Swiss-Prot record:
InterPro entries: CysZ_sulfate_transptr, Sulfate_CysZ. It holds the Pfam family EI24. GO terms for biological process: cysteine biosynthetic process; sulfate assimilation. The keyword Metal-binding does not apply. Its main location: membrane. Belongs to the CysZ family. Keywords: Amino-acid biosynthesis, Cell inner membrane, Cell membrane, Cysteine biosynthesis, Membrane, Sulfate transport, Transmembrane, Transmembrane helix, Transport. This is Sulfate transporter CysZ. HAMAP family: CysZ. High affinity, high specificity proton-dependent sulfate transporter, which mediates sulfate uptake. Provides the sulfur source for the cysteine synthesis pathway.
Amino acid sequence: MPALSGPQYLGEGLKLIMRPGLRLFVLIPLTLNLLVFALLIGFAMQQFSHWVDLLMPSLPDWLSFLQYIVWPLFVLLVLVIVFFTFTMVANIISAPFNGFLSEKVEVVVRGRDDFPPFSWAELLAMIPRTMGREMRKLAYFLPRALVLLVLSFVPGVNLIATPLWILFGIWMMAVQYIDYPADNHKLGWNEMLAWLRSKRWACMGFGGMTYLALLIPLVNLVMMPAAVAGATLFWVREEGEKALVK
């Protein structure tokens, strides 16, 4: 199968999840994500102004005019942090379903569209492994996010915090979603990261498009399973199975 550009994988993933045989595996995580989204957005709307004020640097009177320049930057910073929180929580909750969706997408992509009957036992058996993998992602994410969060409170330095958050977020989107097919094939965490680094620009293209799509409220609910499907297509077409034999 020919490889695609990084951003194309997300679009192809969206087409894949519309297939009748995959809809059940999309609807379950979609419903869970909707509940998480509603709860988090309700809380964020109540706290948004407070968070922006907390992060905004205190400027002397003679520099007060700069407030109108830097305020949008800190609004964006809060939005990025809220986005990260939603994505992280939603993916932890949906991890077993996302792993199962990735498995079924790969069956379709490789041309064997003969799904076995849905089995709750099979799904339940995936929970310990997928949740363990999500904790590994969290252990990778949190120290780096903490450094960026500290930078967000350092006057002057916090002006570069937003672009750093965005670049880190793009990379994490690739890690988050491409790990589902990698984990299904029992590829180790460090080996998976090494393989992604070898495909760095394709990963950043896929991660960047996914990042942008997930920033759009409500649209992001559909794009999360689309990202799982797109990442699975990425794994197949970029020949991820070769990483298994190194």
